[in-house]
Amino acid sequence: MFSPPFILSIAGGGSTYTPGIVKSLMVRLQDFPLAEIRLYDIDEARQNTIAPVVEKVIRDHSQSIKFTVTSDPEVAFSGAHFVFAQMRVGQYKMREQDEKIPLRHGVVGQETCGPGGLAYGLRTILPMVELIDLVDRYAHEKAWIVNYSNPAAIVAEGVRRLRPNARVLNICDMPVAAMRNMGAILGVDRRKLEVDYFGLNHFGWFTRVLVDGEDKLPELRKHIAKFGLLTEDAAKTDPQHSDPSWVKTWRNIKPIMDNFPEYLPNPYLQYYLMPNQIVEHQNPDYTRANEVMNGREKKLFAAAEEYKHTGILPDAFHVGVHGEFIVDVACSLAFNLRQRHLVMVENRGAITNLPYDAVVEVPAYITSEGPEPVRVGLVPLFHQTLLQQQLASEQLLVEATIEGSYEKALQAFTLNRTVPTMEHAKAILDEMIEANRDYWPALQKAWQDGETVKK
């Protein structure tokens, strides 16, 4: 490996999450020493708005860390030891389309689940591969990419197919946010929990929640039956997951467990198991993308503007599990700590009755050479079947991306549990292709050339 202090590059430096991640790094400098932090983004204007806030966060803790802001990949990645990836291809403008187009057809509109997640995946796979190639060209030969880019399951499958030897660890903060809520309910820090979990990203179940060796899932079941996966005071949840739409999401754990009480579901399973209720309560004219643009994004940009003029930085960003988790994982990679975390890995028999090469989300011990997954064994038929259908949809979408195949994209949309019929799938996909004409040239051409018969 390599020795600290490290050079860290953040790809997607203009993200509203960047200040919180950097703050998490700053409070852990003894655990993860840094020589330099580099922000890299193809949107220079957005990154230049965020960068002064990030520099202020750094300077509040260290005068010696070098800080670089660039849109040049050679400058960004040369000699880097770690790259944190958090790209959002199309930004919130396209997320809004991902959410609103399905809703026009009475189907769940969500960033990473359903047709919206599939569309987002079609935009993100190839740019992620391009990023991997840039890191491979310029960074340290043993550099690790820790990837937060959504939709994580589809991105991870695309990377597995196209760059199977890349040193990329795909992670998601959703299970960790759920663990934070569990810890708050049980009165312990989330790091005191040891969980067993299986599934795909945004599509899995907690099977045990241990505190000092004792399974607390029975206690959590009783609490969830009253309050969902929230403390009695919902304000005590993670600040990044505590606005009204998230409170509803945490409460929806209750009806799922009322029907299927054995395991505790990932919150995103609400979109697959109760889609009609979700659609009934979604506003087709004002979705989560609008909430974020008018909330977190506007607040941070206003704070950046105020800081530019006054030198005062308001409390405009969250330091929560999102930043904490990626730093935990990076520490374990850097120092071979073998910490146990929930991450995405190639299955290789961890879940016995899923395909060997599937990308699954399970506990793993994080070493300097990557994750060593914990064996789950057989999962019940109900869960296996749900997982196989979701996996097939994601794998077909990756094939559609690689081949520029309209038919495989349509198959992927049709297989997704949130989409009721082939007709819905086709109508949504066709509208998505038009909205994404700047991002899906191969698919656009296949559609226009009539690869399959259009109505």
Can you describe what each PLM-predicted range is?
Residues 131-214:
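Internal, well-ordered domain-core segments that constitute the primary functional module
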Residues 27-62:
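Glycine-rich phosphate-binding loop and adjoining beta1-alpha1-beta2 segment
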Residues 66-79:
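Short acidic low-complexity segments
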Residues 89, 93-162:
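Rossmann-fold NAD(P)-binding glycine/threonine-rich loop
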Residues 14:
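Conserved glycine-rich cofactor-binding loop
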Residues 78, 84-85, 147:
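Redox-cofactor binding/interface segments in oxidoreductases and associated redox assembly factors
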Residues 187-455:
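Long, compositionally biased stretches enriched for glycine and/or charged residues
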